């Protein structure tokens, strides 16, 4: 954390096909070893499949899926007098998006389908219907926060 003034977040260029900053961030999360063009191909192919499946606009379906995965609360470890408590804290909007995207990509990578584009399309489809591994991850995080609600007064 800086002592003088807060750092402005870097501006991210919107993606070339849909003009969405959120989708550009998602492409960056999916990217491996700096191979952005491959990541773009995978995401656009997955979004085309998703749009055909849901019958909605591709970007609209993507945002609906991301909405169902974004966490609202999470737990952070806090040490108090020799014991460690899992303290529930609210998640900032930027971190909400980042966690949701990361969970979707991780869940897609763990799936057993043929190509990454198909795995991503299936995971996004499941997420838009409130099922799948990414949604389960969010439910687990929310359950942990609910179970540790008694320690909420240790927030900082």
Swiss-Prot record:
CDD domains: uS7_Bacteria
Top-level division of the source organism's lineage: Bacteria
Record-linked InterPro entries: Ribosomal_uS7, Ribosomal_uS7_bac/org-type, Ribosomal_uS7_CS, Ribosomal_uS7_dom, Ribosomal_uS7_dom_sf
Gene Ontology molecular function terms on file: rRNA binding; structural constituent of ribosome; tRNA binding
Keyword entries, A-Z: Ribonucleoprotein, Ribosomal protein, RNA-binding, rRNA-binding, tRNA-binding
Pfam families associated with the record: Ribosomal_S7
PROSITE patterns linked to this entry: RIBOSOMAL_S7
UniProt key word Magnesium: no
Cellular-component GO terms for this entry: small ribosomal subunit
A Gene Ontology biological process term: translation
Leader sequence residues: none
HAMAP family for this protein: Ribosomal_uS7_B
Family affiliation: Belongs to the universal ribosomal protein uS7 family.
Complexes and interactors: Part of the 30S ribosomal subunit. Contacts proteins S9 and S11.
Reported function: One of the primary rRNA binding proteins, it binds directly to 16S rRNA where it nucleates assembly of the head domain of the 30S subunit. Is located at the subunit interface close to the decoding center, probably blocks exit of the E-site tRNA.
Name of this protein: Small ribosomal subunit protein uS7
